[in-house]
Structure formats: structure tokens, C-alpha cells
């Protein structure tokens, strides 16, 4: 099996981007170890702090954020970074050629129950001139690389540099990421969906109708049964979609009119959309392809519908001209 370093060396990307990816991968090994130590190291539970989204930070949120910041600062090549756990963009090096956006520990609410968590990252080109928030506000089409590391029974890295989506598995004996799927491919059709059903009454009409039809199964208009899956960590749900197909969605809702969307564009939706598209799937916010959205700020949130291409198209058909109403939740 090829190692990650060997795979990157044989790809078309330049050496500096390859080195940055290796830095992210090496740091994820340390994060994996911290996650596995859990209660033994006293790192479970919450802090008394909130992040910029108003969410209570878990201890491991803060620890893993600092691990990535320190590694990216020491590595060189990074102009600046943006994180779910940082209020503002962080300047790293004036000579850096890359911007890195990341969610250091996606699904951190799962930590205390020993369930799936992961790290999500996105790499963008750094524009010339002073570093500001505006430097980061590039559409997902500009991404040079994206990926996630899933900390589960195995530690796995899903990666794309625009040449397909590849899966690597960490060998616990050698601490090397080994290529275990050279070309991940999402089946176009599926019988699985992932959604947080507790918000059903707050969704827009198109999504309510779409999910209701899935639940009717073979006695409804879809004429086949569907199973629901929900891990409560985007990284876990998207990994399942990449591995065996499916549709994952976190739609707009009016539960809190001031926060109609849950997932962050820059360091959750964009990297996952890049991975999914490179594996033959599709990703949308219901009305626009996610990778075509121009961000307005680094912590912008969006609705997300991604996965098996035909099923995403079917979901989007419910958002067509006969269904679409401008939401009252902007």
C-alpha cells in the first residue's frame, strides 16, 4: 500500500501544498491520540467559554484548535488560518502561500459518549496584500485541497486535491497513513438518508414534503423503502455517504429565526462539498451549488444537502418553482 507521502509525491500538486497536507495529517495523529486518551487525560467535558457561534466549548475543542494552530505556525507556508474556535482570522506568516480553514473537532458533543468525531479542513490560495477576513472569502471552487480525519475504530483521512477523493487509513503500528481507497465513488442512487428529525416542524415546506415522502417508503410516491441514519457529527455522516452512498442534509429551519442555518460554509460545507463532488456526488444549499457560493464572512452558515447525485437531484426538485417560497427566516 502507498503511504500518504508517496501518494502526494506522485500527484500533480506542488511540493509546498503536499507538505502542508502532511502537516495536517501528522497533527491529526496527535489529535487521534488525545481523543483516545479521553477521560484518562482529564480532557472530557466542557469549559466555561463560548466560541464565536455562542456554543459552549468542549475542552478538546480548545486543545485540538491549539494543536492545529501551533503545527501550522511552525510548518511554514501558511499565510493565515480561520477556525470554528477563533473569533477572527489568525495571521501566521507574511511569506505563506496558503490559507487554512478548519473545524478542529467536528461533533465534539459526541466526545463525552465516546462516539464519532473528526477534524475537517480546507486549503485556499492566499491572495497578495495584507491579510484580512476578505482574504478568505473565496468560493469553494477555489479550494486547493480539502479533507477530514475521522477518529473512530480506525483513524481515517479522506482527501481531495481536485483529482478525485482518496481514503487513507492510519496504521497504528507504523503511524503511517496508507492508501486504502484510491478513488472513492458515491453511488448515484440510495435508500438511506441522514437528517436531524427533531427539527421537522421548523423546516421549509419543500424539505418537509421530501422527508415525508421518504418516510412513506414503498407505499408513497418514491415506491421504495428508505432507512434513516444520524450520527450527530457531520464528519461521520458524510463518511458514510462517501463509503456507501446516501443523502445527508441539514436544511434551513425557523426554530431560531436569527440562526436559520446550522453548518458553517468555510470549514464544514465547502470542504465536504469538494470531497463529495470529487467522488461523483452533488452538494447544494437547496437553491445553489455549495461550491459556487461566495462567502460573506468566515463564520457564515448555510443549509446543506449532499450525497448521491440522483437523490440530491430528487430533493432539489422539491425546491423547484412549484414548491419554492422565499423563506421567512433570513
From Swiss-Prot:
Enzyme class: hydrolase
CDD domains assigned to the protein according to its UniProt record, in alphabetical order: FBPase
EC identifiers of the protein: 3.1.3.11
Residues annotated as binding substrate: 106-109, 196, 262
Cofactor: Mg(2+)
Binding site for Mg(2+) 2: 103, 106, 268
Main location: cytoplasm
Annotated catalysed reactions: beta-D-fructose 1,6-bisphosphate + H2O = beta-D-fructose 6-phosphate + phosphate
Cellular component aspect of the GO annotation: cytosol
PANTHER family linked to this entry: FRUCTOSE-1,6-BISPHOSPHATASE-RELATED, SEDOHEPTULOSE-1,7-BISPHOSPHATASE, CHLOROPLASTIC
NCBIfam families according to UniProt: PRK09293.1-3, PRK09293.1-4
Stated family: Belongs to the FBPase class 1 family.
Record text on subunit structure and interactions: Homotetramer.
Name of this protein: Fructose-1,6-bisphosphatase class 1
Protein source organism: Shewanella denitrificans (strain OS217 / ATCC BAA-1090 / DSM 15013)
Amino acid at each position: 500500500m502507498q503511504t500518504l507521502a508517496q501518494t502526494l509525491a506522485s500527484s500533480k500538486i506542488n511540493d509546498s501544498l503536499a507538505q502542508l497536507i502532511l502537516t495536517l495529517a501528522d497533527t491529526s495523529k496527535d489529535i487521534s491520540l488525545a481523543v483516545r486518551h479521553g477521560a484518562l487525560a482529564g480532557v472530557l467535558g466542557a469549559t466555561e467559554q463560548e466560541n464565536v457561534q455562542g456554543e459552549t466549548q468542549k475542552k478538546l475543542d480548545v486543545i485540538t484548535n491549539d494543536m492545529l494552530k501551533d503545527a501550522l505556525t511552525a510548518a511554514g507556508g501558511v499565510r493565515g488560518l480561520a477556525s470554528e474556535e477563533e473569533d477572527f482570522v489568525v495571521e501566521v506568516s507574511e511569506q505563506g502561500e496558503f490559507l487554512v480553514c478548519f473545524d478542529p473537532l467536528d461533533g465534539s458533543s459526541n466526545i463525552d459518549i465516546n462516539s464519532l468525531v473528526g477534524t475537517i479542513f480546507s486549503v485556499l490560495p492566499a491572495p497578495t496584500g495584507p491579510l484580512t477576513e476578505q482574504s478568505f472569502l473565496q468560493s469553494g471552487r477555489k479550494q486547493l485541497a480539502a479533507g477530514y480525519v475521522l477518529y473512530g475504530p480506525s483513524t481515517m483521512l479522506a482527501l481531495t486535491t481536485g483529482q478525485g477523493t482518496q481514503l487513507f487509513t492510519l496504521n497504528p503500528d507504523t503511524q503511517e497513513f496508507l492508501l486504502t481507497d484510491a478513488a472513492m465513488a458515491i453511488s448515484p442512487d440510495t435508500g438511506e438518508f441522514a437528517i436531524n428529525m427533531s427539527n421537522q416542524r421548523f423546516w421549509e415546506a419543500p424539505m418537509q414534503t421530501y422527508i415525508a415522502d421518504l418516510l412513506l417508503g414503498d407505499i408513497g410516491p418514491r415506491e421504495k423503502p428508505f432507512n434513516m441514519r444520524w450520527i450527530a457529527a457531520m464528519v461521520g455522516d458524510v463518511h458514510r455517504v462517501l463509503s456507501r452512498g446516501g443523502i445527508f442534509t441539514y436544511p434551513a429551519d425557523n426554530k431560531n429565526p436569527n440562526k436559520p442555518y446550522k453548518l458553517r460554509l468555510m470549514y464544514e460545507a465547502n470542504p465536504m462539498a469538494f470531497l463529495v463532488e470529487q467522488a461523483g456526488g452533488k452538494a447544494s444549499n437547496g437553491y445553489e451549488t455549495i461550491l459556487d457560493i461566495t462567502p460573506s464572512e468566515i463564520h457564515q452558515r448555510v443549509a446543506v444537502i449532499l450525497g448521491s447525485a440522483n437523490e440530491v437531484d430528487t430533493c432539489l426538485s422539491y425546491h423547484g418553482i412549484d414548491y419554492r417560497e422565499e423563506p421567512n427566516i433570513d
